[in-house]
Design a protein with these regions (language model features):
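N-terminal auxiliary segments of SAM/dcSAM-dependent transferases
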Residues: 2-127
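Short structural boundary motif marking the start of a folded domain
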Residues: 2-4, 131, 300
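A short hydrophobic/small-residue beta-strand
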Residues: 29, 187-188, 262
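C-terminal beta-strand of the catalytic ATP-binding
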Residues: 60, 304-308
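A short, charged helix-loop
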Residues: 131-137
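Conserved SAM/SAH cofactor-binding pocket of Class I
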Residues: 139-226
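S-adenosylmethionine
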Residues: 159, 193-305
Length: 310
């Protein structure tokens, strides 16, 4: 079975109308893509940014209804494109596939620093004797493929984590917290604003047999836990974005013991100095680090040690 796709390019002000018209016409799926090259970084809660020009793609099951025969689909495409003032539109066919398998085929094991591997749960570990972090990459952000995650994983693999308490703030899939436990940490407290991330973290901890040493919270739950358990962290990991990292600087100072270590990621080069300025009163920072390859060199990592108590 094949599916028909209708693509149209329109300004973001027309996207809502395009979605409504596609839905009314019987689309089984609608996808929004950037029509140009305008990056959008992860939004804050409640924000739903869009690109200035958007390609809206609707997928239709034209095999299930004889009314799609002949020129009906072409006429529908032209009508909707006209109503939303699309700058262009086009039609394509999409062959049916086992989409679950198709998605899974993009993930392969990743070797990080030292002896740490990230292994999708449906694949065998390339080196059974290594430290293998088994991951379901589909649950939340944090697969090991993104440079920001690998920067933190490589940093963790270089630390002595034995018997350490680690706080992973903005835990996503839980990959950093689970890695810390596999590398010897005593306990991880993982925090995220997204309930799906909290669930993903717990599930990935269970996949790796470390769920008895990892607690995952929404922020309000974490605050309540801290009230009853006011212990300070030996290590804080935060792979989020520059703006929240800057805002969290005083909180992380309060959570981290003197002499404790912190690693921050999710920064592009032109944001790094602002984050340095926010943390310098609290932390002695190392030189920013980035990978040398062209694809990932714009992502930077900051790390340091808490040495003051302002």
């Amino acid at each position: 079975m094949s599916w028909q796709q209708l693509h149209l390019q329109c300004p973001k002000s027309a996207v809502e109308l395009a979605e409504a018209l596609f839905d009314e016409a019987g689309a089984v799926s609608i996808l929004l893509e950037d029509a140009g090259d305008e990056p959008l970084f992860e939004p804050m809660p409640g924000e739903e940014p869009l690109w200035r020009d958007v390609v809206v793609t609707a997928i239709f099951d034209t095999n299930s209804d004889d009314s799609w025969a002949g020129t009906h689909f072409e006429n529908l495409a032209a009508k909707i494109a006209s109503e939303v003032n699309a700058t262009r539109f086009w039609l394509t066919s999409l062959d049916d596939k086992d989409w679950t398998r198709e998605w899974m085929s993009y993930y392969q094991p990743i070797q990080c620093a030292g002896n740490l591997w990230i292994v999708p749960e449906w694949l065998p570990a390339p080196d059974p004797a290594a430290i293998n972090l088994i991951l379901d990459p589909g649950l939340a952000f944090g697969t090991g493929y993104h440079a920001t995650t690998r920067l933190c994983l490589d940093w963790l693999a270089a630390q002595e984590l034995s018997d350490k308490l680690v706080i992973d703030y903005g835990c996503g899939s839980g990959i950093l917290g689970v890695a810390a436990l596999l590398l010897g940490a005593r306990q991880v407290l993982a925090v995220d604003i997204d309930p799906q991330a909290v669930l993903a973290t717990r599930q990935n901890a269970a996949l790796n047999g470390v769920d008895d040493r990892l607690l995952a919270f929404l922020p309000a739950e974490f605050d309540a836990y801290r009230t009853q358990n006011p212990q300070l962290a030996d290590v804080i990991t935060a792979n989020i974005l520059a703006k929240p990292l800057i805002g969290f600087a005083p909180l992380f100072h309060d959570l981290l013991k003197t002499g404790g270590l912190i690693v921050l990621a999710g920064l592009i080069k032109n944001q790094t100095q602002a984050v340095i300025d926010a943390y310098s009163p609290y932390v002695t920072l190392d030189t920013p680090f980035c990978y040398a390859d062209a694809q990932d060199c714009h992502w930077q990592r900051l790390s340091g040690i808490k040495s003051t108590n302002p």
